[in-house]
From Swiss-Prot:
Top-rank taxon, per record: Eukaryota
Protein name: Pseudouridine-5'-phosphatase
Any GO CC annotation of this UniProt entry: cytosol
Taxonomic classification: Eukaryota, Metazoa, Chordata, Craniata, Vertebrata
Keyword Hydrolase: yes
Function (record text): Dephosphorylates pseudouridine 5'-phosphate, a potential intermediate in rRNA degradation. Pseudouridine is then excreted intact in urine.
Cofactor: Mg(2+)
Swiss-Prot/TrEMBL catalytic activity: psi-UMP + H2O = pseudouridine + phosphate
Amino acid sequence: MAAPPQPVTHLIFDMDGLLLDTERLYSVVFQEICNRYDKKYSWDVKSLVMGKKALEAAQIIIDVLQLPMSKEELVEESQTKLKEVFPTAALMPGAEKLIIHLRKHGIPFALATSSGSASFDMKTSRHKEFFSLFSHIVLGDDPEVQHGKPDPDIFLACAKRFSPPPAMEKCLVFEDAPNGVEAALAAGMQVVMVPDGNLSRDLTTKATLVLNSLQDFQPELFGLPSYE
């Protein structure tokens, strides 16, 4: 059972599946590849790789499903297919409302995503204005991010770049993936989890708060200004 919410001053957002509806696109593409080998890219497999860097995720998929290809081949083929669909990614319900609300009230917030720069540019091509509202953005290929989630590197790097940097316990992370929740907790931060409905509920127990949608977030629970 997670501790009750404590007041925070700074917010850090994951991107895939939380702010942008990209996880669905990953599922479609990986299932397409798995079909060739009569394998199923199930939610059990997906929950192992969500939030991980591309090569690491590919190796897990290959090991679990016993696909006869190298991780490099899987990344290359999936990236080619994903390039075609990434620009169609839509914002998740409630994302824009929350970000505009935080901006209006001068609450500092940043983005921490495992996506590398090329992938980030494709995914956000339709939403440049939205992502320009963030104080800074830390990507998965950032030199300070030695280890992907569930290690805390990306959230620690992101918190340090606020000016001035807050205490870690004053940061609230928003995540959709179990690996991301683990990473936030390892960084000493609280975490709001907005899991996909298909994710096993056993994988949501560690979060400070679990929501069905960003639309359900009540900022005042964490000492932030409430919606008007």
